[in-house]
Amino acid sequence: MRSEFFRHLRAGLAAIILAGTASQAGAAPAHGIAMYGAPALPPDFVSLPYANPDAPRGGAVVTGNVGGFDSLNPFILRGNPPWQLADLTHETLMGRSWDEPFTLYGLLAESVETDDDRRWVEFTLRPEARFSDGTPVTIEDVLWSYETLGTTGHPRYRGFWTKVDSIAQTGPRSLRLTFTEDDRELALLAGLRPILQKSQWEGRDITEAGIDDIPLGTGPYVVSDYEINRHVTLKRNPDYWGRDLPLRRGTNNFDEIRIEFYGDDTVLKEAFKAGLVSYVREFNAEAWATQYDFPAVARGEITLSEIPHGKPSGMTGFVMNTRRPPLDDWRVRDALITAFNFEYINDTLTGGRQPRITSYFSGSELGMDHGPATGRVRDLLTPLADTLPPGTLEGYSLPVGDGTARNRTALRRAVDLLNEAGWQVQNGRLVNAEGTPLSLTVLLQQDGLIAQASAMMDIYARALERLGITLKVEMTDKAQYAEREAQFDFDLTMMRRSLSLSPGNEQTYYWGADYADQPGSRNLMGMKSPAAEAMIRAMLTARDRAEFVAATRALDRVLMAGRYVIPIHQYSVGRIAHKSQLKYPDDRLPIYGDGIGFLPEVWWFEANE
């Protein structure tokens, strides 16, 4: 990107030019912006539809994380911060409503303006916006935050920055970004960059900051205490500037949020049963049905809440690293998927209670139709036919086992695929033409899913052993896992990729070729697919919802036929066991369910009578 000198030179010149062109093509400043259509909430909305504006404030909540932490800076690649920090302590120009596919309303910004093609976007800051130390948020803070995060921050911020042509101050409280390409989502993404305080980091390198260098934010909470790998305590800022904003009414109700760290999920759940933790999420339907009958539940001290949602299934499963042979061969990956006896595993571990994920966007209108591609989906994919994985156009579905432990038919099919790929069994071991045996290692993190994932791998390893394949399981703590995942140091690993009702630029970060070899990226499988790139481009340039849906369904086909992940269960409902004093608006749940912005944001504490 450009040097800071030239960026600020351009900012100054652009301010003069734009002042004279503000009346050119573009809508009037608005209170919100939607990816398609208009925002659902009017300019005078009182609160988010899933928040209780009359919720009482006070009390404390204790949540538990598995693993540890060695950083309190969630904006750089270095270190492992608690995942909750960014959303609770920092803010962006716009805030999201989680009851709409993708709509933003003013947070640090009081208004947003863009042109019909969305080649630029302009924000006007609220004059009352303040950092936690009481200093005002300035345009200089915003300009510095965008450039710093885009150039030296965590890789997740860099993709957006490469599409920014210019960023310029246009008035005392306003700035404009122009973009290098036709990508209608960029105007919304521009409103979702965290804003840091420039003066805190003057003369210092934010990427080299120690744990005591906690970034100042504008959010409702501040870090008040911590002990590395033990706990972090957040206190609600009594002088929080935005507490009366419509976007904030009925949210951030707890006086204190304490994050406790535990060695594994079993210890965390025992701490919950002992009353040391306020709530836990349960991802195993069998455990939910059979392990939550302890005395505190019977006494009414613990409530079991199920939170439905309307978002896509996303992808949860074991991702295969195609950077490493022989996982770069789709036939080997297909064989490994075929040998995974989901039906038997599901019945054994969950009592058959959790259906399997059938595609990345399954459970929503964005999910691919099964069978041959038709209509606009086929039109989008056909020009790329020579690059498509087998089954993309014809139709690909996950293999279905017979439900028995031996699963003979599926294993015979797996053998055929491995033979086609040049692997043969010799002396009980599957070897290639050079006589090298096939041995794989699955890397697992000691987190809330470790027990279930480990049990799955035990069953899977026995099936692969019958094929002559050795599968080893390696478990690491959070810090080790994060380092190895960032360097793609695994054959297989657990992947849980949540997907929204309005997928966009993040899809490039998940599946784009430019990120396949970039340390720390989310493209864990290392895929480099021209078809995936083209479908993402079609999504980003779609002018209407129908074209967007067709492009997303086409991308779904490319991802599934690529055979990159061994899918496991859907999580069609959130399961939360919590202290009965913790309440939420159960009559107005957001379409994204128990996701970002739900717990603890819209919950509150209500003392027992």
What positions do the PLM features span?
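Extracellular/periplasmic solute-recognition and catalytic clefts
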Residues: 166-168, 224-235, 260-324, 331, ...
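Surface-exposed binding/hinge segments that line
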Residues: 158-202, 218-227, 372-384
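Ligand/substrate-recognition segments at binding pockets and active sites
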Residues: 45, 281, 390-499, 573
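Ligand-site clamp/hinge motif
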Residues: 126, 209, 242-292, 334, ...
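Gly/Pro-rich hinge or "lid" segments in bacterial periplasmic/extracellular proteins
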Residues: 90-102, 147, 191-258, 263-267, ...
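N-terminal lobe/hinge region of extracytoplasmic solute-binding protein
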Residues: 28-116, 124, 144-147, 216
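Aromatic-rich, solvent-exposed beta-strand/loop patch
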Residues: 108-110, 132, 137, 178-197, ...
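Detector for C-terminal structural segments
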Residues: 32, 65, 81, 88, ...
